Amino acid sequence: MSEELQQKLRTQLWTVANTLRGNMSASDFMYFTLGFIFYKYLSEKIEMCIDAELEEDGSNFKEAWASNEEELKEELKKFCMNELGYFIEPEYLYSSVIEAINRKENILPQLERSLKKIEDSTIGHDSEEDFGGLFSDIDLASPKLGKTAEDKNNLISEVLIALDGIDFGLNEASDIDILGDAYEYMIGQFAAGAGKKAGEFYTPQEVSQILADIVTTGKTRLKNVYDPTCGSGSLLLRTARNGKADLIYGQEKNPTTFNLARMNMLLHGVKFSDFDIENGDTLEDDAFPEEQFDAVVANPPFSAAWSAAEKFNNDDRFSKAGVLAPKSKADYAFILHMIHHLNEGGTMACVAPHGVLFRGASEGKIRRFLIEKKNYIDAIIGLPANIFYGTSIPTCIIVVKKCRKDDDNILFIDASKEFEKIKTQNKLRPEHIKKIVDTYRERKEIEKYSHLATLQEVADNDYNLNIPRYVDTFEEEEPIDIHAVMKEIKDLEAKRADLDKQIDVYLKKLGLVE
């Protein structure tokens, strides 16, 4: 039943999203739709929690609040702040906005107040950083919603009414996170239509699963997990779920995507005290300078520019390599940053463009430092091209471990040819994912797929990690039987001669030739 509800919820939510689609770009209507879903979730969650708390007294949230007992009100507020991290007075609940719509009122002022009240309820509490500015991207005065105030009100009312008719399944007893899964599905659907912008906030679930499976290998429980470029938080959530992580840390540069990540955490039921997502530039302003993590995962922006400022030569994250990543390509700056935050027993896995495997100059020096001096590189996994939204370039996964003192090899996997093509996108199927993860975990050699290269072999290749140097995927063509080909040609020539004769006969009968 829960799987049926899961699929039904996905379809219903995407139908609602398309109500806004004609009025604005994919990214714009994404933030409105996901924001309203989140508002409904917070409202239903608080009503459900308080109603359950008051059930023995034969009361519910709205009745208790209407009694005007100040002591009871304060108790309810305190309970919600401890359990949920926020509070919504009944007049600002989603259901109250729906009542106003049914009364044919202009609900935009009430809706705007409601969203602000949720944020304001956390001021001075431990959850303030998790809720502050959470709805700042929902601009109810946006001309994209309509030309007049009435047009805007009608469109928003239509969306809210449609969402109101959808059961979020919060009361479903299931091992499937029904609403969380639907939210992830929505983000993925928006990413599919967002073109190049998609890479800023979304890592395909198949890639997230590979990264999560790799960094949790051999671990029954993670103390913490970290993503320095966390986007919408999907990769973090997948890894945290895989590794039963106690704490989740992330940093995101884009303020709008940062809001999306925090919503995603809360909507997946991660308690406000169990995650810390910060807004800022990871390389320029590290939000967690003293922290180290059991698992580090990331899908950083490919070959982005960074300042490579002189000050970074004295930054512990980069100084040990003796050289900075080039200004035009921050790939190794992100990799060194992640390694710095990885604890001694942890595992790091990040997505990168293939250029990091073979480019020279400062990047070649950093690569040699990581292999020759530190022996940190555990595996290189080549992925198919065109599996990320917004870019068709082939990518790889770099796996790093600090506890490799006794390992004198690096595993190379070429999974670039194993995928299913769906329209314009390539997709990894479950069997492809399983093969990659199993090969990594067992560190096994498979002809034309994987190779366990010794460090000496890598050194002999001048620390070039380009996968074709280690995994030979060349398919030899079957030998050609020259005699058989010559005979086939002769047979065809004989058939052609016969046909020419037949054509001549027909042409003579028609009087077209003498």
What are these model-predicted stretches?
Residues 1-215, 273-282, 287, 382-386, ...:
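Non-catalytic, mostly N-terminal accessory regions of nucleic-acid modification and defense proteins
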Residues 4, 286, 290-514:
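A conserved structural/catalytic subdomain of Rossmann-like adenosyl-cofactor enzymes
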Residues 40-53, 190, 219, 243, ...:
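A generic secondary-structure signal for well-formed alpha-helical elements
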Residues 191-194, 246-247, 420-421:
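Short small-residue beta-strand/loop micro-motif enriched in glycine and branched aliphatics
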Residues 197-298, 303-312, 318-321, 332-333, ...:
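Conserved S-adenosyl-L-methionine
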